[in-house]
């Protein structure tokens, strides 16, 4: 095989990031997302996958059709959709974060499992309708560290049994919709306090500890036939003292491939994440990951450099050509499983009346889940007097982007004045004591506190801090507290619940109903 043809074969194993928006000028992260011209070139040169972020569901449907025409072979078209299509693409259904389903599971195991499977089915069907074929989900990490800055609400629970039951149910639902699935982040990102987008997390667990805890959901999903496993950028010095999991033969080849007998696709987490790119070049990371047993290389910082380097490794026989053929065959096998993309099921969803009914059904189901996952302490009613304040802490303007969202609309209907605080806005904290609100800014009004709190990549848990617990306690002492509603993180809800009198109205919801 000449080097040019070899490079095209190697390129099949790479996944490039692109925007779901149609225009280059609309890209949210132009330094991370390939331009239209560059994306077309890469696909014509053989790159085998695209991961999308942003845009509307209609735009993405068009984008998927376009990139398939540019490509030299069938593509893996994927997205990090963990909470429904609407999490990444406007106009899609946005479901409760997985941790919210775990709260339902605690009350009723069967109901939690049923809901998880239906979420998987609706998500897979909706994703298929717009042209995707691989969902980078479910998250199989067990969030047994409440200070985890990046997994947090993305996890399906805090213990192996809960996560195993719910991820298996979710994966069954996606598979029913004829979509490919991905268990991540092997061998477990739950017990970390570092965001791998920013640095390399170090986890002290040895192999026997992992097998008794973190690996249980992965084993179950592998036995259930999950199509791919994503390896996390995680350092386990008691298993491999030299390399992070992504580049570790001990973890990828010896544990996942040989011990677990896994013969599906193994994919890296994004190689441009600082956990890898701080220390390894795109060229070295690609070669080392593949040599460790990886099949698919996701989002290297410099994709051309990575493809060239891996091509050289095969051409010089540093890595055998047999390994290349095995990975290409694994990729083909998974694409063959989902069959003809123009099957009857997808064709049915092209009819607008069927499509609209499906979206309405998914939307109603999403809202019904939220209603099932709301916790209210006691039967207290929050009342407002003139000029009382609805203080909403957000970290994302999408949380209050619709004036009809309950967090805004319901308090306003009973007399509260909405006041939104955001990290980019004016600080509400005292200059001398950052743990207390500057009450002088709020007059003599009583305050309803609503907090949107969740761990997020690159941001972490900035608002899951003790200062909110203390600030709310101070409001209670000064008799300025009307009530508290926590959205997202159940850990903050638990702390506040223990710290304030039971007469204070208190509620928790993993999300808000969009109606």
Regions found by a protein language model. Give the residues of each.
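Short, well-ordered coil/turn segments that N-cap beta-strands
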Residues: 10-12, 46-48, 72-75, 132-133, ...
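Alpha-helical scaffolding segments of alpha/beta enzyme cores, especially the outer helices
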Residues: 59-69, 122-125, 161-173, 216, ...
């Amino acid at each position: 095989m000449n080097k040019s043809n070899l490079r095209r074969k190697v390129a099949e194993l790479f996944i490039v990031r692109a925007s779901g928006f149609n225009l280059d000028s609309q890209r949210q992260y132009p330094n991370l997302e390939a331009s239209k011209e560059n994306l077309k070139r890469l696909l014509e040169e053989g790159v085998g996958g695209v991961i999308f972020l942003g845009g509307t569901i209609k735009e993405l449907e068009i984008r998927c059709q376009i990139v398939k025409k540019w490509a030299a072979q069938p593509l893996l078209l994927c997205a990090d959709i963990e909470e429904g299509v609407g999490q990444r693409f406007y106009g899609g259904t946005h479901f409760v974060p997985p941790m919210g389903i775990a709260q339902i599971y605690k009350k009723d195991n069967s109901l939690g499992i049923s809901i998880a499977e239906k979420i998987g089915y609706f998500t897979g069907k909706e994703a298929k309708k717009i042209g995707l074929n691989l969902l980078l989900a479910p998250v199989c990490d067990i969030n047994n560290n409440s200070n985890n800055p990046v997994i947090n609400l993305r996890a399906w629970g805090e213990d192996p049994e809960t996560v195993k039951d719910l991820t298996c149910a979710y994966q069954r639902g996606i598979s029913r919709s004829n979509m490919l699935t991905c268990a991540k982040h092997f061998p477990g990102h739950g017990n970390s306090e570092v965001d791998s987008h920013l640095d390399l997390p170090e986890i002290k667990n040895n192999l026997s500890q992992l097998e008794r805890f973190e690996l249980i959901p992965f084993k179950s999903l592998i036995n259930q036939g999950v199509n791919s496993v994503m390896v996390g950028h995680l350092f386990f010095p008691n298993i491999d003292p030299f390399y992070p999991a992504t580049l570790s033969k001990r973890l990828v080849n010896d544990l996942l491939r040989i011990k677990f007998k896994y013969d599906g696709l193994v994919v890296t987490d994004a190689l441009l994440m600082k956990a890898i790119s701080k220390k390894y070049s795109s060229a070295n990371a690609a070669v080392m990951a593949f040599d460790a047993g990886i099949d698919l290389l996701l989002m290297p910082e410099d994709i051309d450099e990575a493809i060239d380097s891996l091509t050289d490794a095969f051409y010089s026989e540093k890595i055998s050509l047999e390994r290349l053929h095995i990975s290409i065959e694994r990729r083909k096998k998974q694409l063959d499983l989902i069959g003809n993309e123009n099957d009857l099921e997808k064709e049915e969803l092209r009819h607008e009346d069927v499509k609209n009914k499906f979206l309405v059904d998914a939307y109603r189901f999403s809202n019904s889940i939220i209603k099932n996952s709301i916790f209210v302490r006691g039967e207290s009613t929050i009342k407002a007097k003139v000029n009382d304040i609805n203080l909403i802490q957000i970290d994302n303007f999408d949380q209050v982007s619709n004036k009809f969202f309950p967090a805004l609309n319901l308090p306003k209907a009973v007399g509260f004045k909405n006041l939104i605080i955001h990290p980019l806005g004016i600080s509400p904290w005292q200059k001398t004591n950052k743990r207390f609100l500057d009450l002088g800014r709020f007059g003599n009004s009583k305050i309803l506190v609503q907090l949107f709190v969740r761990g997020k990549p690159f941001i972490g848990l900035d608002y899951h801090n003790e200062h909110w617990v203390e600030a709310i306690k101070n409001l209670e002492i000064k008799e300025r507290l009307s009530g508290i509603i926590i959205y997202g993180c159940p850990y903050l809800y638990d702390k506040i619940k223990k710290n304030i009198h039971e007469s204070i109205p208190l509620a928790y919801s993993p999300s808000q109903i969009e109606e």
